[in-house]
From Swiss-Prot:
This is DNA replication and repair protein RecF. It holds the Pfam family SMC_N. It is found in: Cytoplasm. InterPro entries: DNA-binding_RecF, DNA-binding_RecF_CS, P-loop_NTPase, RecF/RecN/SMC_N, RecF_2. Keywords: ATP-binding, Cytoplasm, DNA damage, DNA repair, DNA replication, DNA-binding, Nucleotide-binding, SOS response. GO terms for biological process: DNA replication; DNA synthesis involved in DNA repair; double-strand break repair; SOS response.
C-alpha cells in the first residue's frame, strides 16, 4: 500500500496543500518549525483518528479557522481508498472512507497501516508502563478490529467495576457479574499481546543482530500481574477476588491488562534501568522495524513508514540499517538536510522543500 496524494486545508500552518507522493521515498527538507512534522502527523491521524503529538484536536486547526480538513488517497492492491477527515474546534470530527461515513473509530483501523519512528519514541523504553501498553495497543488495533473491540469493552467494564468498588451501596453479586465480563475481554487482550511480543522477539532477533553486528542479543518479556500457566481466566478471576479488600479501599482495580508492562533486555540487562541511550534507541528501532515485518506478515502488504527527524539521532550503523530497508516500503522522511540520503534515492524518489507552511517539489 502507499499514499498517492495528500490534501490539507487549514491544518496547523498549512492553509491549502495538495501533493502527489512517490510510492518510494519521499523526503521533506527544511529548518525546524516550518511544518515538516505536520505532514507526517496528518497521515498518522488518518490511520488512528488521533495525533501522536497532542490529545487536543483543536490544536490541529489553523488558529484563524474553525475547522481543518485532511484528505488522503491510498493505493492498495485491490482497491484505492480515499480518507476524508474534518476536524472541528469543538472537538468533534467527521470521517469518511470512500465517501461512506465512519461512525466508530474502530471502523477506520486497517484502512491503511503506518509505523512511525520519531525521537520521542525513546519514551517507550524510558518512561512509564502506560506508554509501553499504548505502543502494543496501537499496533494491535490497526491489524485487528477484534482486539480494538475487546480493548474498548475491557476499559468500559473496568470503569463500571471501579464505580461499583467506590459505591456506598456495594453489592458483591453485581461485582461478580462485571468480573466475569472483564475476565473474558482480558483473556483475549493478554493472549494477543503475548503473541505480538513473541513476533517481536522473532523478527527483533534478526534485526537487532544486524544493527549490532551480532554483538548483542535482545529479548522482550511481557510482564503481567497475573501469574498463570494455562488458564488465564481462572487466574485473573482468583486475583480479582483475592484483591477485593484492597480494591475496595483504593476504589480501583489493582490488577489486569491495564496494569501490565513489558521489559526489554539486552544481553540479559534491563535496558530501561541500565542500558545506554544508544542501546535504548536501538531497542526502539528494533521494535518499530519488527512491527513493519509483523504488519506485512498479517496484511500481506508493508505499512507506510514515517520517519520524523530521526536520522540525525542515529549513529552510522543504525542509520545504515534504516536506509537499507527503504526499497520495498513507501517511506516519508523529515530532515534538515539530504546528505545522508543521497545514496538511497532513485528516480522514483521525491524531495520536497518546506518553508513556513509552503512546500516546493
Amino acid at each position: 500500500m502507499y499514499i498517492k496524494a495528500i490534501m490539507l486545508a487549514n491544518y496547523r500552518n498549512y492553509n491549502n496543500l495538495e501533493l502527489n507522493l512517490s510510492e518510494g521515498v519521499n523526503v521533506f527538507i527544511g529548518d525546524n518549525a516550518q511544518g515538516k512534522t505536520n505532514v507526517l502527523e496528518s497521515i498518522y491521524y488518518c490511520a488512528f483518528a488521533k495525533s501522536h503529538r497532542t490529545s487536543r484536536d483543536k490544536d490541529l486547526i489553523n488558529w484563524k479557522e474553525n475547522e481543518a480538513y485532511i484528505s488522503l488517497l491510498v493505493g492498495k492492491k485491490r482497491l484505492d481508498k480515499r480518507i476524508d477527515i474534518k476536524i472541528l474546534r469543538d472537538g468533534k470530527k467527521a470521517i469518511k472512507v470512500n465517501s461512506i461515513k465512519i461512525n466508530k473509530i474502530g471502523e477506520l483501523f486497517g484502512t491503511f497501516n503506518v509505523v512511525m519512528f520519531s525521537p520521542e519514541d525513546l519514551k517507550i523504553i524510558k518512561e512509564s508502563p502506560g506508554i509501553r501498553r499504548k505502543f502494543l495497543d496501537m499496533e494491535l488495533c490497526q491489524i485487528s478490529k477484534k482486539y480494538y473491540f475487546n480493548l474498548v469493552q475491557y476499559n468500559k467494564i473496568l470503569n463500571e467495576r471501579n464505580v461499583i468498588l467506590r459505591s456506598r451501596d456495594f453489592n458483591k453479586d453485581i461485582l461478580e457479574v462485571y468480573d466475569l465480563q472483564l475476565v473474558e475481554c482480558a483473556d483475549y487482550i493478554v493472549k494477543e499481546r503475548l503473541e505480538y511480543i513473541d513476533k517481536i522477539n522473532y523478527y527483533g532477533k534478526f534485526i537487532h543482530n544486524e544493527i549490532t553486528s551480532g554483538k548483542e542479543d535482545i529479548v522482550f518479556k511481557y510482564d503481567s500481574g497475573i501469574k498463570f500457566k494455562d488458564n488465564f481466566k481462572y487466574a485473573f478471576l482468583e486475583k480479582l477476588r483475592n484483591n477485593l479488600l484492597r480494591d475496595r479501599e483504593q476504589g480501583i482495580t489493582s490488577v489486569g491488562p491495564h496494569r501490565d508492562d513489558f521489559n526489554v533486555l539486552i544481553n540479559n540487562i534491563d535496558v530501561k534501568k541500565f542500558g545506554s541511550q544508544g542501546q535504548q534507541r536501538t531497542a526502539v528501532l528494533t521494535m518499530k522495524f519488527s512491527s513493519l515485518k509483523i504488519i506485512k506478515e498479517i496484511t500481506k502488504e508493508y505499512p507506510i513508514l514515517l520517519l520524523d527527524d530521526v536520522l540525525s539521532e542515529l549513529d552510522i550503523n543504525r542509520k545504515r540499517y534504516v536506509l537499507s530497508t527503504l526499497s520495498d516500503i513507501q517511506t516519508i522522511i523529515t530532515c534538515t538536510g539530504i546528505n545522508d540520503l543521497e545514496d538511497y534515492l532513485d528516480d522514483k524518489s521525491k524531495v520536497f522543500n518546506v518553508c513556513n507552511g509552503e512546500i516546493v517539489n
